[in-house]
């Protein structure tokens, strides 16, 4: 393995959301291509992911294709979430991206530079994380504006379903849960439910339906779909556990629910991988009301733990 680093660009508090993201990821994309002759290795295929490395197929086609070793390289570009496209002002085309004005049309879309659009144009194959999502992003509702670009290139668009690591997410060996179980010993799942109820201060009852929700608290995840029905739901003989963080309005809403329905509702406003797996194991039902979901892993994890997903018809 070869790892590309630059402390000026990447020794930061987080991976994304920096003021100079355009420069950081342009550097990384160009460094990927500059590395190849240094290590004397020209791959058959380069796989770029999302807007952060979208410039790899663009640079390959516009600046490297004619150089020795680069001519036969093919590129695959994967879209995990089309909402995040890498949009920037046109005035940084040369100064930051190092692309000539004569080549601006590759990136230009809807009055700005759109890195994802450039990758869709230049890549040999474009993939998404499910067959359904590959169809959905041809629709204006799901494409965040890129549907005409994708419609013109349907011939190279593929949907490949995401997967989970079944060794990490395995109730038979998971060290994070109270009692391990398998298909043959699935009755032991009730002990994980009782342990989760005890951990969160809910009444321990193996028979009350326990609903779990592990998610980022963002509009995409359909949180606002729950608000109109929460009172009605909480009048039923159920318990509910929410784990996640995100938009303040949704965090505050679930904090309110924890207060208003404290005998049967718990909100843990953070992310904790061990607690997430305890919820997958301890819940009876897993709620996933996403308005848009490219593929979704949580429902796969829930099923791995024998917890029934309640989902929206997307992704």
Predicted regions and their residues:
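Catalytic cores of nucleotide-sugar-dependent glycosyltransferases that transfer UDP/GDP/TDP-activated
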Residues: 1-315
């Amino acid at each position: 393995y070869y790892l590309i680093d630059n402390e000026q660009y990447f020794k930061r508090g987080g991976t994304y959301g920096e003021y100079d993201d355009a420069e950081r990821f342009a550097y990384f994309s160009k460094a990927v291509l500059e590395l190849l002759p240094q290590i004397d290795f020209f791959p058959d295929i380069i796989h770029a992911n999302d807007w952060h490395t979208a410039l790899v197929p663009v640079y390959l086609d516009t600046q490297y294709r004619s150089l020795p070793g680069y001519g036969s390289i093919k590129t695959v570009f994967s879209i995990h979430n089309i909402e995040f496209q890498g949009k920037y002002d046109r005035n940084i085309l040369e100064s930051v991206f190092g692309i000539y004005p004569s080549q601006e049309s590759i990136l230009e879309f809807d009055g700005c530079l759109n890195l994802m659009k450039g990758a869709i144009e230049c890549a040999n194959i474009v993939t998404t994380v499910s067959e359904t999502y590959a169809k959905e992003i041809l629709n204006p509702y799901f494409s965040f504006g890129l549907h005409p670009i994708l419609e013109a290139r349907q011939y190279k668009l593929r949907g490949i379903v995401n997967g989970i690591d079944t060794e990490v997410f395995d109730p038979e060996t998971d060290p994070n849960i109270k009692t391990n179980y398998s298909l043959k010993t699935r009755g032991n799942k009730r002990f994980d439910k009782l342990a989760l109820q005890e951990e969160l201060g809910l009444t321990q009852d193996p028979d009350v339906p326990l609903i779990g929700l592990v998610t980022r608290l963002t509009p995409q995840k359909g949180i606002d779909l729950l608000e109109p029905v929460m009172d009605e739901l909480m009048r039923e003989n159920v318990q509910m556990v929410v784990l996640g963080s995100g938009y303040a309005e949704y965090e505050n809403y679930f904090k309110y629910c924890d207060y208003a329905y404290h005998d049967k509702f718990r909100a843990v406003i953070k992310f904790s991988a061990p607690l997430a797996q305890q919820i997958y194991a301890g819940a009876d039902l897993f709620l996933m009301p996403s308005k848009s979901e490219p593929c979704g892993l949580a429902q796969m994890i829930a099923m791995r733990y024998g917890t029934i997903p309640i989902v929206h018809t997307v992704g």
